[in-house]
Amino acid sequence: MRILIILSIILCSLSIRADLEYVDNEIYNYNGGSNENGCVEVYDPYEKFNRKVFVFNSVLDYIILRPLAVGYKNITNDYVKARVNSFVSNVDTPLTAINYGLQLNYDKTMKSVWRFLINTTLGIGGLFDVAGKVGLPSDRQTFGSTLAHYGVAPGPYLVLPIIGSTNARDMTDSVITNYALNPLMYYTHNDFDLGVLAVSKINDRYVVLPFSDYVMKNSTDPYVAIRSALHRVREASVQYPENFKCPKPKN
């Protein structure tokens, strides 16, 4: 049983989840950043390699992860899904506080800390978003956001096996934020804990199920559609320095 749960956790970290969860999270946790001085065009010098990895990851997702997400959709009600979403959002909050601290934004750092404390206590471990009802809405920041805050451009677009779509700057999020510093990755003392982690990852995939299904069924080039969506939403969600200008890609 424990081995099966661990396997499901690994599989729930596949590329389409990583790609589309990222888009979804950035859309619904948009922090007011502007893309007026951002990088409009995607720099994809490794497109040939990226496309091959995209196909590989997409096949694994279709065979393994998507069926899990569809099953989760069918056997859970809206109330359960809302509790899981709230719990996962609460787990992300300390990382948001850390990144606002690195950006020297004291006000938002403290708001993130208070949001986490309120939801962890009054919200019963984050199952309920009490803080949001008292003026402390969800606000997601990552290490990639912090690098952008200090003027780091996105760099080359990359699609990595298992990890999924990212760019040179936001690889810190793919590896550090989502895995190394994700508290859920260490909250696995028994089968129940592993089950909680597995459900949270399956929920991540479920959240973007409508978007992923639409792209895969209707887009003439799903690779370009997902690449464009990721880049556009990400650039709109980060806040560059006032005088930042996106560097022109080297030929």
Swiss-Prot record:
InterPro entries: MlaA (IPR007428). The keyword Signal applies. The keyword Disulfide bond does not apply. One of its GO terms (biological process) is intermembrane phospholipid transfer. It holds the Pfam family MlaA. Keywords: Signal. Belongs to the MlaA family. This is Uncharacterized protein RC0123. It comes from Rickettsia conorii (strain ATCC VR-613 / Malish 7).
